[in-house]
């Protein structure tokens, strides 16, 4: 065992585009002794930033015990471990179990946030997730599958709020997804965008509504790595709509901590 204390970094690798990797994440990759990356989800070019002398492992075939064994062994030898996740580790990143094991073994760890696919997709669609007068709330969720949802978190219940919905890990169950949106009272013309592999070379956006989005997704043969985005914020004509409220933040007639309202302004 080394006298030098090792450390594990949980790194958000972003949605795919290596230019969306944070500077801090890049810096850690360049000094890490061990790199464990989600090779089924993280763009391979992200690993190109790794220290040339680093041991690199793909995690798609590793279970929790195997992964944490690598992390614990490296830490006991005073090494730096970069555990690279896709997007941001805090959103469906499955890192809590690893952190518990590290904590129980007195191993230091740190989370380095990344650009989540939801935000990269919003940028790709050239919209905001929170549009004044349309939706000021965002729900991150998924359909119930093999992993059950907690009570009161079924999609039909969450969708009843009518706010912006970002639905992860559900692309293979679009018919069920649309059915739950209908059950929640969404109109048939509700805008839906499906963002596939945002930031990758094969990036694709499919637009539709409740009447056709399931068929469009099936026809495109998309079964993985896609985010379903639901709500008026994703209307393809959002930039041309006249009935969308303007933000008060920069309105001449709005007073806030750093600026007084201009007299007689609307």
Q: In which residue ranges do the predicted regions lie?
A:
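A contiguous loop/helix-start segment that scaffolds small-molecule binding in enzyme catalytic cores
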Residues: 2, 6-8, 77-81, 137, ...
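Active-site catalytic pocket residues across diverse enzymes, especially alpha/beta-hydrolases
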Residues: 50, 125-129, 181, 185
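Class I S-adenosyl-L-methionine
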Residues: 1-116, 120
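A generic local structural motif
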Residues: 20-24, 43-44, 68-70, 126-127, ...
